Structure formats: structure tokens, C-alpha cells
Swiss-Prot record:
It comes from Methanocaldococcus jannaschii (strain ATCC 43067 / DSM 2661 / JAL-1 / JCM 10045 / NBRC 100440) (Methanococcus jannaschii). It comes from the Archaea. The lineage of its organism: Archaea, Methanobacteriati, Methanobacteriota, Methanomada group, Methanococci. This is Uncharacterized protein MJ1153.
Length: 62
């Protein structure tokens, strides 16, 4: 599911631009594919904590 969304977004970008996929994006996609559900939940929790610490908690409804 997560992989399909990334591919769809990337396909839209590629229609507008003619360049190679950045290495960081390839690595991020590979890492996301290997994540288990628990790892994904932990990653999301950490991201939310960081955003709250930085004062951007208005973006999230928890």
C-alpha cells in the first residue's frame, strides 16, 4: 500500500520532469519496503514526537 502510493506520486512527478530518480529516494523506498508494521508504527510515533517538540503539533490531530 505504502509502496503503491510512493510509486503513484513519483509517476506524476516523472510525467512533468525528465530526470533520474534521486539516490536518496531509491534508498528511502527500499527501506520502506523492508519495514515491518511494528517498525512503521515506531517510525510514525518518532516523527510525531519530533514535530511536536519542534512546535508543529498543529498539523496533527491525536
Amino acid at each position: 500500500m505504502k509502496e503503491n502510493i510512493l510509486k503513484q506520486k513519483w509517476a506524476k512527478i516523472m510525467k512533468k520532469h525528465k530526470y533520474k530518480k534521486p539516490k536518496w529516494l531509491i534508498k528511502a523506498e527500499q527501506k520502506a519496503e523492508k519495514m515491518t508494521l511494528e517498525e512503521e508504527k515506531e517510525w510514525i510515533e518518532k516523527a510525531i514526537r519530533v514535530y511536536k517538540d519542534k512546535g508543529i503539533d498543529g498539523l496533527f490531530e491525536i
